[in-house]
A protein has these predicted regions:
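PAPS-dependent sulfotransferase catalytic domain
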Residues: 115, 129-218
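Extreme N-terminal, non-catalytic leader segments
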Residues: 1-17
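The Walker A (P-loop) glycine that initiates the GxxxxGKT/S ATP-binding motif of P-loop NTPases
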Residues: 21-22
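Conserved catalytic segments around the Walker B and adjacent sensor/switch elements
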Residues: 42-45
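A conserved segment at the C-terminal end of the G1
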Residues: 28-40
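Residue-level marker of structural boundaries
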Residues: 40, 50, 59, 181-182
Length: 218
């Protein structure tokens, strides 16, 4: 399998791109779960804060020096929840990380990776690790979750479509605040409740500004 992949390249035209943007606690993980495994959809099992990761000085050093083996191992270490166990989402995963690394390196070793190619290759490697097919038409779905991550992804992939999850504001507010209270007792304050409410407003305002060019109604 790996020998055949060494000289294999994917036509850029067969890929489209989409982001999942949440507006609070609105079911973005559920949406991604529904898309996971759909033929032609290439995605991870959860949120991927890629652009926060890529800004780290150590990551930039690995990219510059083409230390791709160290780079992908660090990615796995920093995104443990995507490969092994996601405690927050209560998910048990059993991804063959050795296979993932081999496939990623086969896709990357002959290239000078920038952040855009790196991001694309980790998605392809994950998809192929799960023994899923690359079809004639594919959509890479990035669970960006937050506005900053979404903006960064759109800058790299210009024709990205946004998949935006929304919910009744009252249920959204109650669920979000209660979830944070259960997760971190320090968040039990009016200040955090206000910040959460403001985040819902800001995320949805951003989504509305993008609706003409990027917005996809579900």
């Amino acid at each position: 399998c790996f020998k055949k992949m060494k000289n294999y390249t994917f036509n850029k035209k067969i890929f489209k791109y989409a982001c999942i943007l949440t507006t609070g606690r609105t079911g973005s993980d559920y949406l991604q779960g529904c898309l996971d495994g759909v033929p032609g959809i290439i995605t991870f099992s959860g949120e991927v804060p890629f652009y926060k990761f890529i800004k780290q000085s150590r990551v930039q050093s690995f990219l510059r020096n083409r230390e791709y083996n160290n780079l992908i191992k660090l990615f796995i270490k920093k995104h443990y929840n995507l490969f092994y166990k996601d405690k927050l989402e209560n998910k048990e995963l059993n991804i063959n990380t050795n296979r993932f690394i081999k496939i990623f390196l086969n896709l990357s070793l002959k290239k000078n990776l920038d952040q855009k190619i790196f991001l694309k290759n980790i998605y392809l490697a994950y998809h192929l690790t799960l023994k899923r097919k690359i079809l004639k038409s594919n959509t890479i779905v990035h669970h960006s979750h937050h506005v900053k991550e979404t903006e960064s992804f759109i800058k790299d992939f210009k024709n990205t479509k946004l998949l935006i999850t929304i919910r009744d504001p009252r249920a959204n507010l109650k669920s979000g605040i209660q979830n944070w209270f259960n997760y971190d007792k320090k968040k039990r304050s009016l200040e955090h409740s206000y910040l959460y409410l403001r985040r819902i407003h800001d995320d949805f305002s951003y989504a509305l500004k993008k609706k003409n060019k990027y917005f996809v109604r579900l």
